[in-house]
Curated annotation (Swiss-Prot):
Belongs to the class-II pyridoxal-phosphate-dependent aminotransferase family. Histidinol-phosphate aminotransferase subfamily. One of its GO terms (molecular function) is pyridoxal phosphate binding. It holds the Pfam family Aminotran_1_2. It comes from Cyanothece sp. (strain PCC 7425 / ATCC 29141). The keyword Ion transport does not apply. Its cofactor is pyridoxal 5'-phosphate. This is Histidinol-phosphate aminotransferase. Homodimer. InterPro entries: Aminotransferase_I/II_large, HisP_aminotrans, HistidinolP_aminotransfase, PyrdxlP-dep_Trfase, PyrdxlP-dep_Trfase_major, PyrdxlP-dep_Trfase_small. Its EC number is 2.6.1.9.
Length: 374
């Protein structure tokens, strides 16, 4: 290891977004990529043409992008308000925009836990980037479990971890939850939400709503009265802009102002800002196609549920989560599916299968039935 590097980095492993990519970074051709929870349909051709026109006619490539994201923030605030009981709670001062939600996660950790000021709490299995990002920054991670039948957070264990004092560990300063959770697909229950509301103001509650558009359940309205809550969302899923890396946070103005202080200047390219603004302006037509995801998710569930070797759970997101009798058998099924042309993600002891197109889902079902019929 290079002598100028932090010693703890030697034990870290780089995140691999698409394990099927070869050494040159090129994804294997013909592989159904159902491992990243991307929307299975690309942007419509007419929207791509509008983006191309904007690039040619409006974007000055020699100029830096809008560093304050002002137009996009206003558009996001308008969109967020549509799902709230009072449609004027949120304005641009409640919004911060990142180069993907990953940048916002890192910024939140920098503002709360750096230099042994705090630790984070996660309930696993969950989105791996909370742990990965914390570890790259030298921030301790405290993990608690979930109910193996429902995947509800073990709130008693979580509360005990928060109250515990350990000699070599700073206090927990951030609690990360996903609503609905990835990879398991379950939304936060009333009991889990009530537990989050009991957390003291010196603990930041981060609620990741990356899959909000698929479940239409949000806790964004809570930020008006809870200065220690923040909501994360993304344009990478339902809005089909994974290539553009646009994430955003919704929180009280005081917390947002701190995030704005520490984020990198010009962190979001002008073209990505244009794409997000265009997607929001066309949200009715884009989000209408979520109906396809719901239909296909239900079809996958109904087709897989009768298989004796599989255990699966209802999902409120754009994926389903399955397990076999052992983790080894589950992992092997994932490898066998990849060999047949379907790439899904093995995580948390189960397989997370993104809902694809009708044709992709047909192939997934055929291949699973073929493998488990042996």
């Amino acid at each position: 290891m290079l002598p100028f590097l932090r010693s703890e980095l030697a034990g870290l492993t780089a995140y691999v977004p698409h394990p099927e990519a070869d050494a040159d970074g090129a994804a294997a051709r013909g592989l159904d990529r159902l491992d990243a929870n991307e929307f299975p349909l690309d942007l419509p051709e007419d929207l791509k043409q509008k983006l191309a026109w904007s690039y040619q006619q409006e974007l000055e490539a020699n100029r830096y992008p809008d560093g304050g994201h002002w137009e996009l923030k206003r558009a996001i605030a308008e969109y967020v308000n549509e799902a709230l009981p009072v449609p004027s709670w949120i304005d641009h001062s409640h919004v911060s925009i990142g180069n993907g939600s990953d940048e916002l996660i890192r910024s939140l950790l920098i503002t709360t836990c750096l230099n042994q000021q705090g630790a984070i709490l996660v309930a696993e299995p969950t989105f791996s980037m909370y742990r990965i990002t914390a570890e790259t920054l030298g921030i301790p991670v405290v993990a608690v479990g979930r109910n193996p039948d429902t995947f509800e957070i073990d709130c008693s264990a979580a509360q005990a971890a928060i109250e515990a004092t350990e000699q070599n560990r700073p206090p927990i300063r951030v609690v990360f939850v996903v609503h609905p959770n990835s990879p398991t697909g379950n939304g936060l229950t009333i009991a889990e939400q009530e537990w989050l509301r009991t957390l003291p103001p010196d603990i930041l509650v981060v609620i990741d709503e990356a899959y909000f558009e698929f479940c239409r359940s949000t806790l964004a309205g809570e930020i008006v009265q809870r200065s220690n809550w923040i909501i994360l969302r993304t344009f990478s899923k339902a809005f089909r802009l994974a290539a553009h890396r646009v994430g955003y946070a919704i929180a009280g103005p005081e917390l947002i102002a701190v995030l704005e202080k520490i984020r990198l200047p010009y962190n979001l390219p002008a073209y990505s800002q244009l794409a997000a603004q265009l997607a929001l302006s066309q949200r009715q037509s884009l989000l209408a196609e979520i109906e396809l995801i719901w239909q296909e998710r239900n079809r996958l569930f109904q087709a897989l549920a009768p298989i004796p070797d599989l255990r699966l759970w209802p999902s409120a997101a754009n994926f389903i989560y399955v397990q076999m009798s052992t983790e080894a058998a589950t992992a092997q099924l994932g490898r066998d599916l990849k060999a047949l042309g379907t790439s899904i993600r093995y995580t948390g002891g189960g397989l997370r299968i993104s809902v694809g197109t009708v044709a992709e889902n047909d192939r997934t079902l055929e291949r699973i039935h073929r493998l488990l019929a042996k």
